[in-house]
């Protein structure tokens, strides 16, 4: 398990879906762009998916702690929104 910390800007719409089978009930998937212009796909499940869908939108800045999966995507374990001044 690889834990990572990322800070970036949301550059895509947040795609929210309900899941029929499996241990999770919902998923939110979106992309962020980090400081060096790398684009990373991130995803959150259940409560995190609800938070992402209801509280975040394109062009928001976020800080996340997550786990790198086998596809190179980040599964969010903690997320925080912030503003640049």
Q: What is each of the regions a protein language model found here?
A:
Residues 1-85:
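Single-stranded nucleic acid-binding surfaces, predominantly the OB-fold ssDNA-binding core
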